[in-house]
Amino acid sequence: MDDEKNIGTVLTTYAASPPPSDENMVDPDTEYDEAFRKKAIRKVDFWLVGFYSLVYIFRVIDSSNYSNAAIINLENGTNIKKQLHLNPSQWAWTLSIFSYSYLIFEPSNTLLLKKFRPARWMFVLILAWGICATSVSAVQGFRGMMCVRFAIGMAEAGFFPAVLFHMAFWYKPSEMPSRIAFFYSVGQLSSALSGLLAYAIGFMDGLGHLAGWRWLFLLEGLPAIILSVVALFGLPDYPETARMLTQEEKTFFLQRLATTTPSGKTGNWDFKTLRVLFADPTVYTFSIYWLAHGIGGFGIAYALPTVIYQLGFTTTSLSQLMNIVSYGVR
């Protein structure tokens, strides 16, 4: 998945000071009982882990469904490549343009989270990619597809690192790994779900005089538009401003966070931070690792439905179902 390509962007927030540690925090255990703590944390988990994971399912689907569209209804003559008259070179360009815009806009999208409150910025990102994803269903040619695919990458680029950055306002460093792991794992399941949805939507080919691939993008883009409204009115921004928390719960969260936790009111990003960041060898080793991971992992994901179909022992519908297996075992 493309969301994870430049996770290092969010690390600039912390590079100007020593890594946060639970030792730097005020331990509120003596002030608050266990039932109170669990209840307060569950409220935050519902939104920052549960809601974001739900959104992430459709974010992954809205980017991975292009590979499913490559073979949907191929036998019926209503395939996307045939209807849009895309040759192999043009198809490759429409596939890769998403990653180019993603690469360009991910750093700036992430930094803008410091200028806008999280709920409002997430609303903009989710709504934008939802509209762009549904707009694919109306594309009539190569140029239109290039434009809309570029726009989808631009909108989706900031989501994954912004989620990690938003979580840092709320959780102790020791609490972050398990929540990030759950959030990321959901993305793998959504890739499997994408194949199942493509299989089902393929049977809608011709309904309302629309090809199956147009229904695919239309139906899979709509949930993001709905979820963007939920994000605007439901997501908690910062502990000190969250409407869902009581005053006592706000105090609890503020007391338990590290001194290096980012603030919702002021930022600590500057050029000194960048110098410290790029002097850290971990940045380069992680970048090399992620580059190798992306070349192998993302390349296979984009081509997998087509590869399965071209093996020659199944229909396009069954190929969509067989695509589920590889993600289910990951």
What positions do the PLM features span?
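Extracytoplasmic
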Residues: 47-88, 105, 109, 194-198, ...
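Extracytoplasmic gate region of multi-pass secondary transporters
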Residues: 67, 272-330
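Cytoplasmic helix-loop-helix junction between adjacent transmembrane helices
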Residues: 148-188, 201
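Conserved MFS/SLC helix-loop-helix module at the cytosolic interface between two early adjacent transmembrane helices
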Residues: 103-143
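Helix-breaking motifs and short loop linkers at transmembrane-helix boundaries and internal kinks
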Residues: 62, 85, 116-117, 138-144, ...
